Amino acid sequence: MPATFGQVVIGPPGSGKSTYCNGLQQFYNAIGRSCCIINLDPANDRLPYSTLNSLDIRDYLTIEEIMEEKNLGPNGGLIYLFESMEESLDIFYLKIQEILTENENTYLIFDCPGQVELFTSNGTLFKIFQKLSKKFDLRLCVVNLIDSIYITSPSKYISVLLLSLRSMLMMDLPQVNVISKIDMLSNYGNKDELLPFRLDYYTEVQQLDYLQPLIEIESENIGYKYTAKKLSKLTAHLSEIIEDFNLVTFEVLCIDDKNSMVSLQTLIDKANGYIFGVSEIGGDTIWSELTRQGIMNELNMVDIQERWIDNKDEYDKEEEKKRLEAIKQKELLDKEVNIQENNTDGNEDDEWGRIMKDWENATGKVASANK
């Protein structure tokens, strides 16, 4: 059996994990890559994606059952569930084995819960994926989603940097950090006052000391006047730790934007190794062609500040125009194919008529009207 590839989707509550999995499923279906979503959140009873080709942990155990049986709260119940699951993975093994037996090239997408302690302080989730990786030769990449609203506050931005760094160290897997819902960023305020720095400052994670004066002002504005300087010093030390590790950077994602998805998935495929010679085996030839043609060079030339903040409306209009043109081209192509098929059917009828005429002349009999 060849190596199995996949993504582990993590992130705080509300960061868009299930929405991302839904969009990813549609994207992979479009490029011909077989995939399966595995929901690991026992509290998520409203899945936006199709459950026909997915595995749902709620089919076996729900958080409500754990809470009632063990008299635990939501977070405690979730940790208990994963600790129990880590000790006995037999059923989980069998279900994944069934999926891979049906199609050994299936790409696995793990939709994880939003409780951050599972991937920052509790090692159970890491142990589960470690065992799965050994069992099925899994090549996984962690996709850490962060809501774009967090970069509008300097202190919240530092907190998500710490969260991302901690998850990278805890999960011990290749990790791509993503600022999700980037298209919503312009809705959070006037674009001239929305961010004190350009968007690429927040994605490249450099020169964090520039945030110190802003954090002091922010602390004073929310009523922490007497502790503002202490908070600023604490933030300075935390910023030094983040910069010393030099591990955290961010990509941006709009789930409805094709170019944004192509750019992100190319990076993820490089991180887990899928892109290196496996795409043909997986059958997603369209994706292979996109990569070979160097589409990423074109996408990387787009300035994210200009695309998502300065000139977002103009870019959106241009993308919509391209989308409508693509739909029109497809309709014309389908129409041409139908015409060719009809002509082929007509030619077949003419050929059949000639054959029957020759048979009648040779035998002196009248052929039936039915073929």
Per-region residue spans from a language model:
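Nucleotide-state-sensitive switch-loop elements of NTP-binding domains
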Residues: P2-I10, S15, T19-I128, S133-R139
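Structural beta-sheet core signal
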Residues: I37, V142-N144, N177
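Switch/connector loops and helix/strand junctions flanking conserved nucleotide-binding motifs
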Residues: D45-P48, E117-T120, I151-S155, M184-L195, ...
